[in-house]
């Protein structure tokens, strides 16, 4: 069976690594266009991302964090959303504070009027400004902040070492389907690629669904624009979302 993944990026290269590991006896082709620029913004994950790449034999979590300059993300702090001066911290993943000998009834009676971070390891880390790992990474289940470009480069380098992954640098110009609408082949500038299963990792381009019915939620999205910029500051393990009169930052 031949899998065709259209689009590089984190989703494309990670799909190639996961599928080719889970189903190593199949053929995998990934098409990436040099005409499409990488969006140079930060990315955030959940702890499930780390658990996922841990299962890949050619990826070491410590190496991944070092090469991509990733930093821990233990939660999101919402400021002023319930009134000026209010704060709510939402931990992302992290183990609950558990003890088999602890009387859970008394414990939950205590925290019933407390915030979520009372029962979360990440809530404690946030209050103490501590990192969720030491020199040796073990049972690392924290979310991460990622550098998008560095992460793509890392995943791509690992993918290209797999013998069952073929890389094609080309630009898709047309999608050919059968009478039922199933994709049969992809016409590129310099290649025609056929396959059995096609995976769309083209992001906003949505090349496989561009002609599908579209349901707009524009009227339900009062905040429909964003301005991005970078600034120098100490690395934080918490994403802050401060409510403003118009929108948030």
Regions found by a protein language model. Give the residues of each.
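N-terminal Rossmann-fold NAD(P) dinucleotide-binding loop
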Residues: 12-13
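Glycine-rich FAD pyrophosphate-binding loop
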Residues: 20-41
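Beta1/beta-strand and adjacent pyrophosphate-binding region of the FAD-binding site
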Residues: 1-9
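A structural signal for isolated positions on well-ordered beta-strands in alpha/beta enzyme cores
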Residues: 4, 27-29, 166
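Predominantly flavin-linked oxidoreductase catalytic cores and closely associated redox partners
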Residues: 140-249
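A short, surface-exposed helix-loop junction/capping segment
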Residues: 28-33, 133-140
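Dinucleotide-binding Rossmann-like beta1-alpha1 core, especially the glycine-rich loop
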Residues: 37, 41-127
């Amino acid at each position: 069976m031949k899998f065709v993944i259209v689009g590089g990026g984190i989703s494309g290269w990670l799909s190639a690594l996961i599928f080719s590991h889970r189903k190593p006896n199949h053929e995998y082709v990934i098409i990436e266009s040099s005409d499409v620029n990488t969006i140079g913004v930060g990315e955030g994950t959940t702890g499930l991302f780390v658990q996922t790449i841990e299962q890949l034999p050619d990826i070491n979590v410590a190496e991944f964090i070092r090469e991509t300059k990733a930093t821990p993300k233990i939660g999101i702090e919402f400021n002023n959303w319930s009134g000026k001066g209010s704060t709510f911290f939402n931990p992302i993943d992290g183990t609950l504070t558990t003890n088999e000998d602890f009387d859970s009834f008394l414990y939950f009676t205590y925290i019933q009027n407390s915030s979520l971070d009372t029962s979360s390891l990440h809530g404690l880390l946030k209050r103490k400004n501590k990192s969720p790992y030491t020199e040796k990474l073990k049972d690392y289940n924290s979310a991460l902040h990622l550098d998008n470009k560095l992460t793509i480069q890392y995943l791509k380098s690992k993918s290209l070492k797999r013998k069952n992954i073929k890389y094609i640098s080309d630009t898709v110009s047309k999608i050919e389907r059968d009478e039922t609408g199933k994709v049969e082949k992809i016409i590129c500038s310099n290649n025609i690629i056929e396959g059995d299963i096609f995976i769309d990792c083209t992001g906003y381009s949505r090349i496989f669904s561009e002609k599908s019915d579209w349901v707009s939620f524009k009227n339900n999205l009062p905040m429909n624009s964003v301005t991005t910029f970078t600034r120098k500051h100490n690395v934080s393990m918490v994403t802050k979302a401060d409510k403003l009169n118009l929108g948030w930052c």
